Amino acid sequence: MDTNTQKYMDTRAENKNTILFATLSQIFGDKMNLARIKFFGLFICALCKVQTVCFEKLAASFDSEVEVGSSLRRIQRFMAEYLLDTDLIARFVFALLPHKPPYRLALDRTNWKFGTTDINILVLAIVYQGLAIPILYTMMPKFGNSSTAERIDLMQRYIELFGIDTIDCLLADREFVGDHWLAYLNYKRIRYHIRIRENFWIDIPKNGHRVKASWFFSHLKLNQYEFHHGIVYVNGQLCYLSASKVKNKEGVPELQIIASFNKPDEAHSLYKERWQIESAFHKKRPL
């Protein structure tokens, strides 16, 4: 590698660090002193380098002239004594996003065991170029599905922090249905593409008939996709339906039926992006 190329690469690295520290100062300036902000920046850079939460490896990767043992003690003190404001973390992540809003959001829940403790987290993530970037979360003191109130609280936190205009649409799986939840999204006019079960009862406004969701799409063959042109009631809320026939994890063909606020013709391609949040969960689970 020639000298000019090396200088250019170093300059780019310096610029990235400058942007990082400037953003940290802007977001955390009222909550942290300068020394702690610099430490936090080193900590984030080390996390990106080693991609592990092992304190010893992180301390050894600090871009600093301080001894590893000293860096390790700083990490331990920081983790033990400092309570991070998750809203500030969300603002920090949001400020570093490489493109401008509106964003596609994915809502999902992940759970696992840490020793004998059940971990159950409701997560809202921004989907970007094949990645799901967690932006807000709620630790749920229970095992099982989230409630409508917990989902609404999480969405309201996002809206209060970043504004409803930064939302392109919301993607979610079959767990995230319910009349009050859909009513909230419709009232806020938040575009959504949410999967529903095949056996959901659907009410057709123009003739008053009630049918199963699968009735609209029973003719589909494997890998075919179709959307229903008319508006319908799902759980008492007006929305549009679309579906594709896919193979599930066991290789059995099934209907993937999606309820949408509008533009059901886009639901199939957009819903695929929801899988990024499940991939993110898989990578972040403890070994």
Predicted region positions:
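Short, basic interhelical loop/turn and adjoining N-cap
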Residues: 61-74
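Single, function-defining residue in the core of a domain
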Residues: 2-52, 64, 89, 100-103, ...
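Residues at alpha-helix boundaries and short interhelical turns
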Residues: 52, 66-69, 83
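Active-site-proximal, Lys/Arg-enriched surface segment
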Residues: 72-129
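Short acidic/histidine-centered micro-motifs embedded in hydrophobic/aromatic stretches
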Residues: 61, 78, 287
